[in-house]
A protein has these predicted regions:
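Helix-to-loop junction immediately C-terminal to a conserved catalytic motif
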Residues: 65
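Conserved ABC ATPase "signature" region
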Residues: 114, 118, 125-143
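Catalytic Walker B motif of ABC-type/P-loop ATPase nucleotide-binding domains
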Residues: 172-176
Length: 329
């Protein structure tokens, strides 16, 4: 069996936006939401698909699910065209949009699941087994007879994820699945998704602004900005690519003036604690040795940059590149 489940080759998506140019005139502007995407996703992968607002994440998901037609390029999911073979592919994919529910608003959760069973023609035994699993792992038991409109956002999101998995899809598209959820609900959703991937080999494409989702779930990350993939690889590689500095956190026995240490720069100072940045390519050992020889230390640690800082730096570089291309063009 071919291990490639999703293929995206040279895909673009443009929209025409009409803007007022005067009291009686309007101008037409072409906006490129996606500008030349190329990537593949293998069966069983959990891939984080991240980027700033307007980067093209949701547009990509809508094209992969057949909701939108690409302007140019080629898309294949399980060897099929998402638009032309949309009905057939619906049996093989599940979709959760964080800001839109697929559940029936005025019906109890249980009835929404029963409708899904009939729509997808799920065998009774498969349906019962999958429903029991979702109810147990997502703690949906007390909610089954509650109308969807009375559920909290976190409860509804758990309900949506269960609905998307009842028919055992090969691929699950999650667009902001933890948006607005509390800490407990987020943890429960993450644990469920990780278990589903491990036990069933379900392929997951996850778009999110919560980078903890990515760190805890995904072995691979794609960063998209201005409609293009600017990074595709593992979390370790992402840290290395965006890492320009590390930080020495120095806890002194008493409050002292700013530390002056060759090869570092002071970035913060609070009481007896000082933060010193140094190049990521430099070894921390000689800096630590010099600090230990010159000062009475209570504690000392080396901190790697947070993933949020790494990605923010990548977004900034993509912004500058796009501006340069626009000027040249």
């Amino acid at each position: 069996m071919d291990q490639t489940l999703i293929e995206v080759e040279g895909v673009t998506k443009s929209f025409v936006v009409r803007r007022r140019a005067g009291r009686l005139r309007r101008t037409r502007e072409v906006v490129n939401a996606v500008a030349g995407l190329d990537f593949t996703v293998r069966r069983g992968e959990m891939v984080g698909y991240i980027g700033p607002n307007g980067a093209g994440k949701s547009t990509t998901v809508k094209m992969l699910t057949g909701i939108l037609l690409p302007s140019t390029g080629r898309l294949r999911v399980a060897g099929a065209d998402p638009v032309r073979d949309r009905v057939r592919l619906a049996q093989r994919m599940g979709v959760v949009f964080g800001q839109r529910t697929t559940l029936w608003w005025d019906l109890p959760l249980r009835d929404s699941y029963e409708l899904a069973r009939r729509i997808y023609r799920i065998p009774a035994g498969t349906y019962a087994r999958n429903l029991d699993r979702c109810v147990e792992l997502l703690e949906l038991g007390p909610l089954l007879d509650v109308p969807v409109r009375q559920l909290s956002l976190g409860q509804r999101m758990r309900g949506d994820i269960a609905a998307a998995l009842l028919h055992e899809p090969e691929v699950l598209y999650l667009d902001e699945p933890t948006i607005g959820l509390d800490v407990v609900s987020k943890r429960r959703v993450r644990e469920f998704l990780a278990q589903t991937n491990a036990e069933r080999g379900t392929t997951v494409l996850l778009t999110t602004h919560d980078l903890t989702d990515i760190e805890q779930l995904c072995s691979r990350v794609m960063v998209i900005d201005h409609g293009r993939v600017v990074y595709d690889g593992g979390l370790d590689g992402l840290h290395r690519q965006g890492r320009s500095e590390r930080t020495l956190v120095v806890d002194l026995e008493r409050e002292l003036p700013p530390i002056e240490l060759h090869g570092t720069r002071l970035v913060r100072r609070e009481g007896t604690r000082q933060w010193l940045a140094f190049p990521a390519s430099a070894s921390a050992a000689p800096l630590v040795a010099e600090l230990a020889g010159r000062y009475e230390l209570r504690d000392l640690s080396v901190r790697e940059p947070e993933i949020e800082d790494v990605i923010a730096r990548m977004y900034g570089e993509a912004e500058r590149t796009a501006a340069t291309v626009a000027r040249i063009g």
